[in-house]
């Protein structure tokens, strides 16, 4: 049921192997890098006083380790992880909780997602959803309200046209 809900055409054994590999990667991977242009994009948002958050289905130990290793912890006001909520994506709870902690109405939030389950969660929460297509694992983001392939190109999206570079 979990594999079906996550929309992943893999076996349980493959999922367990991938989870172990990903955990090791977040904690020890020498090639762990942020997506190209992400630092600049986050800096531009922060320079304008725009609050930011992370809402992930991954457990907090891995996300916080990765954010720390990437020196990105300070770029986010809120971090919500899979073990901090009762229901994970595609349920909207992670996004609703993040919006609440940011002091924002979900309709005032932009979700950046690279998976169908995350896009459904963001839309169910009432957020505008930007589908990111620059991840190494490409998934269908056609249900998103907007798409972006490279964070360097953020100013091509009307929502960000007036966002000053950091």
Give, region by region, the residue ranges found by the protein language model.
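Asp-based, Mg2+/Mn2+-dependent phosphohydrolase catalytic module
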Residues: 43-46, 59-166
């Amino acid at each position: 049921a979990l594999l079906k809900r996550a929309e992943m055409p893999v076996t349980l054994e493959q999922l367990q192997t991938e989870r172990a590999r990903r955990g090791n990667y977040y904690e020890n991977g020498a090639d762990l890098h942020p997506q190209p242009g992400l630092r600049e994009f986050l800096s531009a948002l922060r320079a304008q006083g725009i609050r930011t958050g992370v809402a992930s289905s991954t457990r907090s130990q891995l996300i916080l380790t990765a954010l720390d290793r990437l020196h990105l912890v300070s770029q986010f006001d809120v971090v919500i992880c899979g073990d901090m909520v009762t229901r994970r994506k595609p349920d909207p709870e992670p996004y609703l909780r993040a919006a609440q902690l940011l002091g924002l109405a979900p309709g005032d939030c932009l979700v950046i997602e690279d998976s169908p389950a995350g896009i459904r969660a963001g839309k169910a929460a009432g957020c505008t959803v930007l589908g990111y297509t620059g991840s190494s694992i490409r998934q269908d983001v056609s249900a998103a309200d907007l798409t972006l392939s490279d964070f360097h190109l953020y100013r091509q999206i009307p929502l960000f046209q007036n966002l000053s570079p950091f």
